[in-house]
Amino acid sequence: MTFLSPPEIPTIKADNGTYYDFNNGARILFPKGEWHVNIIDEESGNILFSCDTKAGWVTSTKKYYVKFRIQAFKKGDEKPFLDTVMELKDKPVLISFPTGTLGDIIAWFHYAEKFRIKHQCKLECSVSEEFITLLSDNYPDIKFTSAQDKYEGKPYATYRIGLFFNGDTDNQPVDFRLVGFHRNAGYILGVSPQEDPPRLNLSAERKIQEPYVCIAVQSTAQAKHWNNGLGWAEVVRYLKELGYRVLCIDRNAHAGNGFVWNHIPWGAEDFTGALPLQERVDLLRHASFFVGLSSGLSWLAWASRIPVVLISGFSRPDSEFYTPWRVFNSHGCNGCWDNTNYNFDHTDFLWCPVHKGTDRQFECTRLITGKQVCGVIRTLHSYLTNHDRII
């Protein structure tokens, strides 16, 4: 994941030619001389770092939200010439999000709004252009900046929201695999990890009169797919028997890597394409429900406030947003994404850390049968029927 870089020089000038700020942790830049510095967690009083130094940088190891206190002394002095506690109220703060992901940003963004409300700061968020289009009108108190542009701002503090692997607890206070990847944003920012969908424009008029269900069958790794060879065909057939049109809304009708490719299910209507996210929301908003994977379009459906049938074994049931229509099979190997013994390999499309190359590869979703998913759909359909919510 790539993020905006902090300013080359800290943004606040102190006495004695010293500069400091809180961009990607506490940062202090000293001129020539003999100095002593303390970096303190103000909430606990713990001294996180204390050292003598000459000209150069002192930076905190921890980059997530900590209420830092910085004390800087001329070496030998008892009284600091700089003694400041980080205070974000009315200060310019940047939250930098990575690009190239859909579900991650949908999952994380409302934590930024919680942060703004908590601290009453002047918040700026760096996201890709497609998310500026999707979100900016619904968050008028946040300034949006394109992550693709060169950044020349001078914020007081910067935070980076992402997934940090290999047990990294410098950029996140806890390993994201222990708390669910979306809640990780709450922990990084020091706000409640309770999940909340972002605010979207849900005002589009309905264009398809018949009841319909949206599905999405593609994802970024084969482990995230539903690897039951007959599953999607059974689900599409069953949905049509219930009277729904079935619209496949993946970006691509066919996607894969090397010798493994996944295709739009037989019988589904092809609504695939690289469409603006708002157009996807406009279609999802009026669907009776969505059936998908541990992938970005499931998150977009959740944010569109419709029921989501989520099929996954690669991740554990609390790894994504809560849905009563989660489909998970505990009878085989499962949950490798959330297992701290394994580090996900983004370069290996066929990553399966325990059973790759054996007949048990991807059994986490292969053992989820069409019967099991159709059973969940039957329960959801009955609920919608009984509450007069078939739309």
From Swiss-Prot:
Keywords, ordered alphabetically: Cytoplasm, Glycosyltransferase, Iron, Metal-binding, Plasmid, Transferase
Result after altering C364S: Loss of iron binding. Loss of catalytic activity
Residues annotated to bind Fe(3+): C333, C336, C352, C364
Effect after changing C352S: Loss of iron binding. Loss of catalytic activity
Cofactor note: Binds 1 Fe(3+) cation per subunit.
Subunit text: Homododecamer composed of 6 homodimers forming a ring.
Location in or out of the cell: Cytoplasm
Catalysed reactions, as listed in the record: ADP-D-glycero-beta-D-manno-heptose + L-seryl-[protein] = O-(D-glycero-alpha-D-manno-heptosyl)-L-seryl-[protein] + ADP + H(+); ADP-L-glycero-beta-D-manno-heptose + L-seryl-[protein] = O-(L-glycero-alpha-D-manno-heptosyl)-L-seryl-[protein] + ADP + H(+)
Residues the record marks as active site: D104
Expression induction or repression: At the early-stationary phase, likely due to nutrient starvation (at protein level).
InterPro entries: Aah/TibC-like, Glyco_trans_9, LPS_LOS_Heptosyltrfase, TibC/BAHTCr-like_N
Disruption of the gene: reported phenotype: Loss of bacteria adhesion to human HeLa cells. Reduces glycosylation of AIDA-I.
Binding residues for ADP-D-glycero-beta-D-manno-heptose: T101, L102, G103, Q218, T220, K224, R251, L275, G296, E320
Name under which the protein is recorded: Autotransporter heptosyltransferase Aah
Effect recorded for T220A: Loss of AIDA-I heptosylation and loss of bacteria adhesion to mammalian cells; in an aah2 deficient background
NCBIfam families found in the cross-reference section: hepto_Aah_TibC
KW Glycosyltransferase (keyword) present: yes
Superkingdom in the source lineage: Bacteria
Cofactor(s) the protein requires to work: Fe(3+)
Pfam family, one: Glyco_transf_9
Main location: cytoplasm
GO BP terms in the entry: lipopolysaccharide core region biosynthetic process
One GO cellular component, as annotated: cytosol
